[in-house]
Regions:
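N-proximal helix/coil linker or "cap" segments that precede and/or mark the start of modular domains
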Residues: 5-35
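Thiol-/selenol-based redox modules, centered on thioredoxin-like
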Residues: 137-177
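Structural micro-motif
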Residues: 110-112, 129-132, 136-143
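A short beta-strand-turn-helix
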Residues: 36-55
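Structural microenvironment flanking redox-active thiols in thiol-disulfide oxidoreductases
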Residues: 70-110, 121-122
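Short active-site neighborhood of thiol/selenol oxidoreductases, capturing the structured segment around
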Residues: 49-70
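Short loop/turn microsegments at loop-to-beta-strand junctions
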Residues: 33-34, 55, 139-141
């Protein structure tokens, strides 16, 4: 009996490891941004091509209405006018559903789209998915995508209290080149 339990646990651990190891490689500057086709809280489908010709701040975050994610989203909200003046749109992505996104956006007056990547396929294409088998969580990664739909800058280590300011600084510098 103990051997059967041990073998079952080993099989489960192996399956979980194999699922986690299928993550896409991390994207780097100049890579073509992977396309996405995701609904927002109202069911409207957003695609990368919708943002062609403009800068896009595509940020992945773990969970609606949690402390770090709320801080990050509210800073993007507060700095949105500056980002838009620089020609950028902001879009958030997590594995939460549209209902969760709608409640989160309403609670904090978030004026930008939050997209539902329930199956985690888009997060995985961006290398931004933690897949634990039954549980999938988006990593806190951000991609600054240029008007030609190429990755201009990646952010894999994010300080939620100043992340939007870091993007403003980088976007200002990139546009000056």
């Amino acid at each position: 009996m103990k051997l059967l339990v041990l073998m079952t646990l080993i099989a489960i651990a192996t399956i979980a490891y194999l699922k986690m190891s299928k993550a896409a490689p991390l994207l780097v500057s100049s890579d073509v941004a992977p396309n996405f086709n995701l609904p927002d809280a109202n069911g409207k489908i957003h695609q990368l091509s919708d943002y062609a010709g403009q800068w896009l701040v595509l940020y992945f975050y773990p969970k609606d209405d949690t402390p770090g994610c709320t801080k990050e989203a509210c800073h993007f909200r507060d700095d949105l006018a500056i980002l838009e003046k620089l020609g950028a749109k902001v879009v958030g992505v997590s594995v939460d559903d549209g209902q969760s996104h709608g409640a989160f956006a309403k609670k904090y007056s978030l004026p930008f789209p939050l997209l539902s990547d329930i199956d985690g396929l888009t997060a995985n294409k961006y290398g931004a998915l933690t897949n634990l088998g039954l549980v999938k969580i988006a990593k806190r990664y951000t991609f600054l995508i240029d008007p030609q739909s190429r990755i201009a800058k990646t952010y894999f280590s994010v300080d939620t209290s100043r992340h939007s300011l870091e993007i403003i600084d980088d976007l200002t510098e990139l546009k000056a080149k």
